[in-house]
A protein has these predicted regions:
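P-loop/Walker A phosphate-binding loop and immediately adjacent motor/lid segment at beta-alpha junctions
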Residues: 150-188
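Conserved P-loop NTPase motor cores
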Residues: 1-23, 27, 37-41, 56-163
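An amphipathic, basic-hydrophobic helix/alpha-beta surface used to engage anionic
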Residues: 32
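Conserved P-loop NTPase motor module
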Residues: 1-4, 175-212
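Short, aromatic/basic amphipathic alpha-helical patches
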Residues: 43-52
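Intrinsically disordered, low-complexity N-terminal regions enriched in serine/proline/glycine
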Residues: 24, 28, 141, 180, ...
């Protein structure tokens, strides 16, 4: 899950992860499906090679069910990019349930040897329906001053005191386009990253942080 206001760097980060040689997701997937009203309009579109039947400008139940039928029993490594489709999701509770089902059964949807990964973007973290955002295993948060958003992130994810959480935010967002990366399933001492550099705590309550 990637959360950031317009211009924060969400799209650039997706392109970097997927398209740049040696990066995390470069050439890791057999199929990529994109659900986005805007990614197809990028200048020098890096997704031009993706077949038309894997690129959608909206997201609904019928489209997603059709895609799930296509990948069933293929054994493929599949990536869904759900970019800027929060409004489609929020207004459709059946779609929300289907997405939750996908997120909770990612390893079984494409058959033996296959898997489904999902990258979802939003301009505001708490605009994503709670049942969906609570299934996220990795969360990337760009700078925000939205107190309700930060309080939601803190209440749902953060196990350190709020004062320390805000010190982590201040330390992380010292440069434009920096992001806080959370590995949700890690223990509290190993879940925080400034960009992709893990924050090291000398003690459980010490915020004198050092990068790997």
């Amino acid at each position: 899950l990637i959360s950031g206001k317009p211009g924060s760097g969400k799209t650039s980060k997706i392109l970097n992860l997927l398209c740049k040689r040696g990066k995390m997701y470069n050439k890791k997937f057999d199929r990529v499906y994109i659900f986005s009203p805007s990614l197809g309009t990028l200048k020098d579109n890096p997704f031009e090679s993706i077949p038309d039947d894997q690129f959608f400008t909206e997201l609904d139940n019928e489209i997603l069910e059709s895609v799930l039928s296509e990948i069933k029993d293929t054994g493929d490594k599949v990536l869904f990019i759900m970019d800027d489709v929060v409004n489609d999701i929020k207004k459709n509770t059946a779609l929300q349930r289907l997405i939750c089902k996908i997120l909770m059964n990612r390893r079984h949807l494409a058959g033996q040897g296959g898997s489904v990964s999902v990258i979802m973007t939003t301009q505001v973290y708490n605009k994503i329906p709670a049942p969906i955002r609570k299934t996220a295993s990795h969360i990337m948060i760009y700078h925000t001053r939205n107190k309700k958003e930060l309080d939601c992130i803190f209440d749902e994810l953060i196990l350190v005191p709020k004062k320390e959480f805000y010190e982590i935010l201040n330390y992380t967002f010292d440069k434009k386009n920096n992001f806080l990366y959370l590995v949700v399933d890690n223990d509290v001492e190993n879940m925080f990253y400034k960009n992709f550099n893990q924050l090291q705590f000398k003690t459980k309550t010490d915020l004198n942080m050092e990068l790997n």
